[in-house]
Regions:
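A short, conserved, highly charged catalytic patch centered on acidic carboxylates
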Residues: 1-147
Length: 147
């Protein structure tokens, strides 16, 4: 599991390098095909996404919860496999969810026509993931009602 304690050692393995333009402790990675750069600012404990990635809220752009490291990793993987930054939305308000209300999902991905087609709800390894998976299997969580 990625945590505040081990992310610094993990990022170079994922292609991140010291930012030449920063006087702070920042590691960054440029995704050539996506034309995007994402960074991790250790001094301020935050994730920095390219401006083309829409962020409806900035709740998950810090180190405060283990799940936010998973969101960051997922965005990096989406860029790595060829999604454009403009296709990625962080924390959009989404209809549905629990008790027929709206909720904020972690990541929304749009297709090439800018139509939403994939929601990604991130969970960190361990109890959070296991608890949520049990809820899905029991039908208590209505992500699948959005289809």
């Amino acid at each position: 599991m990625i945590t505040k304690d081990n992310i610094r050692q993990l990022l170079p393995e994922l292609g991140f390098k010291n930012s030449p333009n920063s006087m702070y402790e920042v590691l960054e990675r440029h995704y050539n095909e996506a034309g995007a750069t994402v960074s991790v600012d250790f001094a301020n404990e935050r994730f920095i996404y390219t401006p083309e990635i829409q962020a409806d809220r900035k709740t998950s752009q810090n180190f405060s919860k283990p799940e936010f490291f998973v969101v960051f990793e997922c965005v990096c993987r989406l860029l790595q496999i060829g999604y454009k930054p403009s296709q990625i939305v962080l924390e959009p308000m989404t209809p549905g969810g629990r008790q027929d209300s709206n909720f904020y999902c972690d990541i929304l991905v749009r297709n090439n026509d800018n139509v939403p087609y994939m929601l990604i709800e991130c969970k960190n390894a361990g109890d959070d993931y296991e608890d949520e998976w049990k809820r899905v299997k029991k039908g208590w969580w209505s992500t699948f009602s959005l289809l």
